[in-house]
A protein has these predicted regions:
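N-terminal strand-loop-strand
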Residues: 65-104, 131, 135
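Unchanged
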Residues: 109-133, 141-194
């Protein structure tokens, strides 16, 4: 099974593509395993996937195995939602505490979330503004160069209207601001802007 041909090859290092695929096959295999032999083999493949990633990154192999073992059921990409919020022609950005970079407010959609509701919640939590998601303006494969993600994800960007609130930071954000196209900060968050 090939992943999206040549474009996929340009975005991810082969070792990460292989490790993700091994992890996903193993996770799904564990879900459907019928005996302890199958469970042992799929568990070993999870360890191999973690080994591959830990050799090529600063991530700990044992922690990766634990993270992978916490994933249950059929493996699918994760959903990350982002809010494109404008005021007087300026885009709302938040500064990440994790890496000090700027990004549109947002985060992982929770199980059971409608994506538009998830982005409304995330903008309120991270920036202090109550918004209404109007429409999807972009869906992006989060596989990019830069800091690598262990799991595959898609980003859904919503155009949002402000209903109320005021700028407020959170435990994940250290600054909130609106920026014109010419004033977008140079240091964009590698964590969530890709």
């Amino acid at each position: 099974m090939k992943n999206n041909g040549e474009q996929q090859d340009l975005l991810l290092p082969k070792w990460l593509e292989w490790a993700r695929e091994i992890q996903a096959i193993s996770q799904t295999g564990l879900h459907f395993a019928e005996n302890h032999y199958q469970r042992e083999r799929f568990s070993r493949l999870i360890e191999i996937a973690a080994d591959i990633i830990s050799v090529h990154s600063d991530l700990d192999q044992a922690e990766l195995v634990e993270i992978f073992n916490d994933q249950i059921g059929y493996a699918t990409p994760r959903i990350d939602v982002r809010g494109a919020v404008f005021q007087n022609g300026k885009l709302l950005l938040v500064r990440e505490r994790a890496d000090g970079g700027w990004t549109m407010p947002g985060g992982w959609a929770d199980v059971g979330d409608v994506p538009s509701t998830a982005v409304e919640r995330e903008v309120l939590e991270e920036a202090g503004f109550e918004v209404s998601a109007q429409r999807v303006i972009g869906v992006y494969d989060a596989n990019r160069t830069g800091p690598l993600e262990v799991f595959h994800a898609f980003k859904i960007v919503f155009l949002c209207d402000i209903l109320g609130g005021e700028p407020r930071t959170s435990n994940e954000t250290s600054q909130v601001g609106f920026f014109s196209r010419d004033d977008i900060p140079e240091f964009l968050s590698g964590e969530r802007t890709r």
